[in-house]
Swiss-Prot record:
Residues annotated to bind ATP: 32-39
Cross-referenced InterPro entries: P-loop_NTPase, RecF/RecN/SMC_N, SMC, Smc1_ABC, SMC_hinge, SMC_hinge_sf
Listed SMART domains: SMC_hinge
Domain SMC hinge per the UniProt entry, residue ranges: 514-629
Modified residues (N6-acetyllysine): 648, 713, 1033
Taxonomic source organism: Homo sapiens
Name of this chain's protein: Structural maintenance of chromosomes protein 1B
Localisation per UniProt entry: Nucleus; Chromosome; Chromosome, Centromere
Keyword Acetylation: yes
The organism's taxonomic lineage, starting at the top: Eukaryota, Metazoa, Chordata, Craniata, Vertebrata
Function: Meiosis-specific component of cohesin complex. Required for the maintenance of meiotic cohesion, but not, or only to a minor extent, for its establishment. Contributes to axial element (AE) formation and the organization of chromatin loops along the AE. Plays a key role in synapsis, recombination and chromosome movements. The cohesin complex is required for the cohesion of sister chromatids after DNA replication. The cohesin complex apparently forms a large proteinaceous ring within which sister chromatids can be trapped.
Keyword tags: Acetylation, ATP-binding, Cell cycle, Centromere, Chromosome, Coiled coil, Meiosis, Nucleotide-binding, Nucleus
Length: 1235
């Protein structure tokens, strides 16, 4: 098997001197520390295989010499040489030598050119451009992240289809150009064919055109004779009818004058009555104003009186309550005085009883001196013997006395608290009743207040709206008056203007659809600055009356003559000779056409404006107007904003004060609207004033609301005071008293129980003491004859103590009663003082109420007097209004009669005007028909007169124009026409319907023929010559089209050939790789479940779009390449590299650190695959840093660095074939089991 044997390098990069690297085995790994020069082996192989210098990590070729990178090249030359051994054993050498700044190539030690050198490399399977035997460091990682388009480019390099890109693009560009030329020639041929058809049609149309002209001429003669014949008949009938109507009209005019005089007299009487009514209304308004002032004063006085009366009632009620309380207080004082008198009587009775007892004691036992001494001695013995018990007894008695006094005090307090509690309950009941009354009164006030508030809101809203509207109306009215005053026209119009306005109104009534109005009323300038200029251009036509037709204009002129009114200018829409607009004038700078600065709401009026203004131009200044009028190739009619007019003839007409006066007519046309609006606003203002008078009612309601609110406030304050202060205080006091009462009762119970218990103990101690006394005083008692010593002592000692105690109790009770009596009397005195104060207040309030009632009565009297006067004036107004309405009714009746006669006169005038209009219309029709015959050269025969005498009516002054027209019509009446050529059936027609129907038929025939002639283009005299020219051009275009189509077919064939070659080269490579990559990926992964597949984005031309590459790792679901791990991406990239290598296999394959991104598992898989493939497929040389990988190789080449001035590389070799590959055997065994 062919293989790379040795690599000989000399002074190349890190290799100093001549170094031999090899021999290389089927699977050789190059190892060494980082920076030792391993990758320089890869660069040496690339260099010797013809790689470009730019791809060898240097800028120029001399940097490849050892030491050049530090500026100390060891030699001026360097070389790299490989020894390649064929399967037959034949050796081939390839060498590349650096000499100076270039390199030379040697094959088998013979100097050859680069192309020969590359060809020899391709013979052994090494393609330099595709780099099919070298995989540089990082290439594997870059392959895994290539974009589909980049992957396509990679395949084009491998398949060599990329060499055809230039030729492919060139052929494609030529094909597109040829197809475009063919399409262009085809379109040209089609257009010339259409021209040929058109030329044929022109020839046929020229022949038809002449026959149509002859037929049209005969029909026009018949039409004109028919119209002239029946026109003359109609003129004769109208003259007869006009004489009858004029006689009836003169009779009706006399009746109209009579009724007009009656109406004027009635109007004068109505004016006098109206003035009287206005004076009455003025007085009534004054009275109502005064009444509106007095009525609130009366209401206020009434409310004040009512308020004081209520205060007086409250005071009286307070006196009544205070007197009731005083009466009760007096009863309590009497009870206390009675109790005090009873106590004094009992005390006196007790003292009297004591005196009797003292007299009785003098008769009782009395001891001798010896016995008394012995008593004292025995008593001292007893005292000493019972001293302890006596002390305890005295203590108990003192405590007992204290508790008894406390019990008596608590019982007194109990009685007092019960009395106070009863009084508090009564006061609470009184306040509750007061609360009920106040709540009821408050509710009544609130209901009344709510009702009045609603009325107030309604009135306020109505009055505010009225005031707002009055303000708006007054502003509008002031604005209208200001506009009228500014215009200087807020005065009565002159009789002349009024007469002209009445005449115009009369004409509008006679011809409502035909008389439009004066020209300045129907249009206006778009801005005020153009008013003078437009007025100047309009000239005498500014006050002209615009009518629909010439017939109406003539009827109006006849009416003016009959009414002896001032002459008027009429502009008939159907009679105006309008010149076309020169559109080029609109493009001139510094000016505008006059017709463009005039605005109108009537579309039909544009013809009139165009007739009056022509092609006139308006300019900002006089200089601009002069320049535009005189400086151009043609003179123009121009006008400046100040009214200066430049005519084409060179005449200059300046603006004047008279022109400014005339220009005011643009504002005068708004007068009628302004006056109408002023009348409407005045009437509306009167209605609003009536509504505004409701302010009096509003003030009354507001006064009532204010009084009610005040009363409600006082009531609510009192209610709140009672609820939140008085009643709460009473409830708190009641609660305190009840609590105090419970405390007193519980205290009394506790004291009673304590007294009972202590009394028992006192009794026990007393019995013990008594027994001791009895023992000691036994003999003494027997001597004095008493049962025991206590009997003696009670009679003489204890009785005195009881008397003293009783006196003390009497004293205490008397003191208590005196204190209570003094307090009650003091309280009663305060109540009486309060009652006296309230009585004084009542007396003063009564006096104030008397004064207030008098003021109220005075106000009421004034209001009643004003109301009576108001009613009197209203009655007068009703009477005056009735009289005015009666006279107005009479005026209306007379006016109806006047209008009825006026309508009859108008009807007759309208009929006269209508007949005259019809007559003038018929004369005009005859004139126009004769004029048409002359102008259109229609050959009718005249028995008298000549068509040459027919002239067009010229526009001069109105009087001149009317007289000229009459002269022309009289002259034309003398013409006698020969109707012998007119068909008899057309002469025999009588009714207007039949005449109109036949006229329409004749007109349709002529119009149809004219329409055909109009639609038919004038014949082309050169149609035959054009037809021949077009035929020659058609033949030329046909020849050009065939030639371009042939050229396009040839370009298509050439392009398809290149496309097929490129497609075949690319597809051959792609199909081989896409088939083999799946098996290679399975072998690399050591698992048949792994999948790898390639798919083109453009199956028809895959080299134009991208190529997708996807792998499914064992045990994982499908996911995009970007989502695979680093090791999986590396394995997938290696599979692609090995698959591409299998398409164009090189004899050896050099890889630079392809295992960098692989983990130990994937390293084992990749190394096993490489081991298998190197047995019989290709030679593999790998630069590796991982022991798991290079331990599987057949031989190792070690690269290590040495240093002096610069680093240089050394090489070691080791044959591993003598060492068994146990790991590889185990891996193969596991792989076999997994299968």
């Amino acid at each position: 098997m062919a293989h790379l044997e040795l690599l000989l390098v000399e002074n190349f990069k890190s290799w100093r001197g001549r170094q031999v690297i090899g021999p290389f085995r089927r699977f050789t790994c190059i190892i060494g520390p980082n920076g030792s020069g391993k990758s320089n082996v890869m660069d040496a192989l690339s260099f010797v295989m013809g790689e470009k210098i730019a791809n060898l990590r240097v800028k120029n070729i001399q940097e490849l010499i050892h030491g050049a990178h530090i500026g100390k090249p060891i030699s001026s030359s360097a070389s790299v040489k490989i020894i390649y051994v064929e399967e037959s054993g034949e050796e081939k050498t390839f060498a590349r030598i650096i000499r100076g700044g270039c390199s030379e190539f040697r094959f088998n030690d013979n100097l050859v050119s680069r192309s020969v050198y590359i060809a020899e490399l391709e013979k052994i399977g090494i393609i330099v451009k595709a780099q099919n035997c070298l995989v540089f460091q990082g290439t594997v990682e870059s392959i895994s992240v290539k974009k589909p388009k980049e992957r396509t480019q990679f395949f084009e390099e491998i398949s060599t289809s990329g060499e055809l890109i230039g030729e492919y693009e060139e052929k494609k560009r030529k094909l597109q150009k040829a197809e475009e030329d063919a399409q262009f020639n085809f379109n040209k041929k089609k257009n010339i064919a259409a021209e040929r058809r058109q030329a044929k049609l022109e020839k046929e149309e020229a022949e038809r055109y002449q026959s149509l002209l002859e037929e049209l001429k005969m029909n026009k003669i018949q039409l004109q004779l028919f119209q002239l014949y029946h026109n003359e008949k109609k003129i004769h009938l109208l003259n007869t009818k006009l004489e009858h109507v004029n006689r009836d009209l003169s009779v009706k005019r006399e009746s109209l004058s009579h009724h007009e005089n009656i109406v004027k007299a009635r109007k004068k009487e109505h004016g006098m009555l109206t003035r009287q009514l206005q004076q009455t209304e003025k007085e009534l308004k004054s009275v109502e104003t005064l009444l509106n002032q007095k009525r609130p004063q009366y209401i206020k006085a009434k409310e004040n009186t009512s308020h004081h009366l209520k205060k007086l009632d409250v005071a009286k009620k307070s006196i009544k309550d205070s007197e009731k309380q005083c009466s009760k207080q007096e009863d309590d004082i009497k009870a206390l005085e009675t109790e005090l008198a009873d106590l004094d009587a009992a005390w006196r009775s007790f003292e009297k009883q004591i005196e009797e007892e003292i007299l009785h004691k003098k008769r009782d036992i009395e001891l001798e001196a010896s016995q008394l001494d012995r008593y004292k001695e025995l008593k001292e013995q007893v005292r000493k013997k019972v001293a302890t018990m006596t002390q305890q007894l005295e203590k108990l008695q003192w405590e007992q006395k204290t508790d008894e006094e406390r019990l008596a005090f608590e019982k007194r307090r109990h009685g007092e608290v019960q009395g106070n509690l009863k009084q508090i309950k009564e006061q609470i009941e009184d306040h509750k009743k007061r609360i009920e009354k106040l709540e009821e009164y408050t509710k009544t006030c609130m209901d009344c207040l709510k009702e009045k508030k609603q009325q107030e809101e309604t009135l306020v809203d109505e009055i505010e709206k009225t005031k707002s509207r009055m303000s708006e109306v007054n502003e509008e009215l002031n604005l209208i008056r200001s506009e009228l005053q500014n215009a200087g026209i807020d005065t009565h119009e002159g009789k002349r203007q009024q007469k002209r306005a009445e005449v115009l109104e009369h004409l509008k009534r006679l011809y409502p659809d035909s008389v439009f109005g004066r020209l300045f009323d129907l249009c206006h300038p778009i801005h005020k600055k153009y008013q003078l200029a437009v007025t100047k251009v309009f000239g005498r036509f500014i006050t002209a009356i615009v009518v629909a037709s010439e017939k109406v204009a003539k009827d109006c002129i006849r009416f003016l003559k009959e009414e002896r009114a001032e002459p008027e200018t009429f502009l008939a829409l159907d009679y105006l000779d309008i010149k076309p607009i020169n559109e080029r004038l609109r493009e001139l700078k510094g000016c505008k056409m006059v017709i463009d600065v005039i605005k109108t709401q009537f579309p039909q009026l544009k013809k009139v404006i165009q007739f009056v203004c022509g092609n006139g131009l308006v300019c900002e200044t006089m200089e601009e107007a002069r320049h535009i009028a005189l400086s151009g190739p043609e003179r123009q009619k121009t006008v400046a904003l100040d009214g200066t007019l430049f005519l084409k003839s060179g005449v200059i007409s300046g603006g004047s004060s008279d022109l400014k006066y005339k220009a005011r007519c643009w504002d005068e046309k708004e007068l009628k609207n302004l006056r109408d609006r002023r009348s409407q606003k005045i009437q509306e203002l009167k209605g609003l004033m009536k509504t505004l008078r409701k302010e009096t009612d509003l003030k009354q309601i507001q006064t009532l609301i204010q009084g009610t609110q005040t009363r409600l406030k006082y009531s609510q304050n009192e209610l709140e005071m009672i609820k939140k202060k008085h009643l709460v205080a009473f409830y708190q006091e009641q609660s305190q008293l009840q609590s105090e009462l419970l405390n007193i009762e519980s205290q009394c119970i506790m004291l009673s129980e304590g007294i009972k218990e202590r009394q028992r103990r006192i009794k026990e101690f007393q019995e013990k003491i008594d027994k001791v006394e009895d023992d000691i005083f036994q003999h003494f008692c027997e001597e004095i004859g008493v049962e025991n010593i206590r009997e003696f002592e009670n009679k003489h000692v204890k009785r005195q103590q009881e008397i003293d105690q009783k006196r003390l109790e009497f004293e205490k009770q008397k003191t208590r009663l005196n204190v209570q009596l003094e307090y009650s009397r003091s309280h009663l005195k305060k109540k009486l003082n309060k009652i006296n104060t309230l009585k004084e207040t009542i007396q003063k309030g009564s006096e104030d109420i008397d004064h207030l009632k008098k003021a109220e009565e005075n106000c009421l009297q004034t209001v009643n007097e004003l109301m009576a006067k108001q009613q009197q004036l209203k009655d007068i107004r009703v009477t005056q209004n009735s009289s005015a309405e009666k006279v107005q009714t009479q005026i209306e009746e007379e006016r109806k009669k006047f209008l009825a006669v006026d309508r009859e006169v108008g009807k007759l005038q309208k009929e006269v005007v209508s007949i005259q209009t019809s007559l003038e219309q018929k004369r005009l029709e005859k004139h126009n028909l004769l004029l048409d015959c002359k102008v259109q050269d229609i050959e009718i025969i005249l028995l008298s007169g000549s068509l040459d005498d027919i002239i067009e009516v010229e526009m001069g002054t109105e009087a001149e124009s009317t007289q000229a027209t009459i002269d022309i019509y009289e002259k034309e009446e003398a013409f006698e026409i020969d109707y012998s050529s007119l068909k008899e059936d057309l002469k025999a027609l009588q009714s207007d319907q039949e005449i109109e129907a036949h006229l329409r038929l004749l007109l349709q025939q002529v119009a149809s023929q004219e329409d055909i002639l109009l639609k038919t283009a004038a014949p082309n005299l050169r149609a035959l010559e054009n037809l021949k020219t077009v035929r020659d051009k058609f033949q030329e275009s046909t020849d050009a089209f065939e030639a371009s189509r042939k050229e396009a077919r040839l370009c298509r064939q050439e392009f398809e050939q290149v496309k097929k070659r490129r497609y075949d080269l690319f597809t051959q490579c792609f199909e081989h790789v896409s088939i083999s990559i799946d098996q290679i990926y399975k072998k690399l992964c050591r698992n048949n479940s792994a999948q790898a597949f390639l798919s083109p984005e453009n199956p028809e031309e895959p080299y134009l779009e991208g190529i997708s590459y996807n792998c499914v790792a064992p045990g994982k679901r499908f996911m995009p390449m970007d989502n695979l791990s680093g090791g999986e991406k590396c394995v997938a990239a290696l599979a692609l590299l090995f698959a591409v290598h299998s398409f164009r296999p090189a004899p050896f394959f050099v890889l630079d650190e392809v295992d960098a991104a692989l983990d130990n598992t994937n390293i084992g898989k990749v190394s096993s695959y490489i081991k298998e493939q190197t047995q019989d497929q290709f030679q593999m040389i790998v630069i590796s840093l991982k022991e798991e990988f290079y331990s599987r190789a057949d031989a190792l080449i070690g690269i290590y660095p040495e240093y002096d001035d610069c680093m240089f590389s050394r090489v070691l070799t080791l044959d591993l074939s003598q060492y068994p590959d146990t790991e590889g055997q185990e891996s193969s065994k596991r792989h076999g089991e997994s299968r």
